A protein has these predicted regions:
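Short internal beta-strands
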Residues: 28-30, 110-117, 182-183
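Conserved catalytic-core segment of nucleotide-activated headgroup transferases in glycan assembly
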Residues: 82-114
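Donor nucleotide-activated moiety binding/catalytic core segment of transferases
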Residues: 128-167
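Structural loop-to-beta junction motif characteristic of Rossmann-like glycosyltransferase folds
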Residues: 176-180
Length: 239
């Protein structure tokens, strides 16, 4: 209605695939891995992020001590879960826990596990049981308790995100902290292409039970998208 009334004095921009004819929009911002092209489509390398590193709050020193204890490193594990493509089984979560234990056994570290609303309760029990047996320096935080996110990212030394969490990967890839992606289940199609492309460009590393520092490229999806949108609007001669 607004577009009909104001005509060229307003421009319609839609983020993600609208599942409607593209002619109804002046501009669409769609992730590159969706493989959608049109003259009014801007592709982004990943999902748009709602924060950047400079906007993260400084966590109080006493709170850092509560989180890290006397450990040198903070490892942040972010887990997704059931999604439209697959439902990880119990062995997938057990295998993930074994890889985490392998990665942390020789590190002075505190492990913080952030869960998603998609993480099933059975998975939480498996992770908790595995970590209790082999690593006392951990805490699991449910989605309803996550008042530390995203600020905790500022004190993380290593980040591990499961492959199903595309938005979380895009957000954390924008930081300089080493980022590792763990495949909960076999990925295919556009998600696999997205992850392989990020790995090729140096934004992420595949998690195989080892954590290490590397020369990480920061994903600047937001900044690059703003530049593309501004260029598009200038070409459209917006006044």
């Amino acid at each position: 209605i607004l577009k009909t009334s104001l005509k060229n004095n307003v421009k319609t921009i839609h983020i993600q695939n609208p599942k409607l004819p593209f002619k109804y929009f002046d501009l669409l911002i769609i992730p590159e891995h969706d493989n959608v092209t049109a003259k009014n489509v801007i592709q982004t390398k990943g999902a748009l992020s709602f924060f950047n590193y400079n906007e993260l709050k400084k966590i109080e020193e006493k709170k850092i001590k509560l989180i890290k204890g006397n450990k040198k490193n903070l490892i942040l594990l972010m887990i997704g879960g059931n999604n439209k493509r697959y439902k990880p089984n119990n062995s997938d979560y057990y295998y993930l826990s074994m890889k985490i234990l392998e990665a942390t056994k020789n590190l002075s570290c505190q492990l913080v596990v952030l869960l998603s609303r998609r993480t099933p309760s059975k998975a939480v029990k498996i992770l908790n049981s595995s970590f209790l047996k082999h690593n006392e320096n951990f805490q699991i935080i449910t989605s309803s308790e996550q008042n530390l996110y995203p600020d905790i990212l500022k004190i993380a030394d290593y980040m591990i995100v499961t492959s199903d969490s595309v938005n979380m990967i895009s957000e954390t890839a924008s930081l300089s902290t080493p980022l590792f992606v763990s495949y909960l289940s076999k990925e295919t199609g556009k998600i696999l292409n997205f992850l392989k492309n990020l790995e090729k460009l140096g934004y992420i590393k595949n998690f195989e039970g080892k954590l290490f520092n590397y020369k990480k490229t920061k994903l600047n999806t937001n900044k690059e998208t703003v530049l593309k949108v501004n260029k598009f609007l200038r070409l459209q001669k917006i006044t």
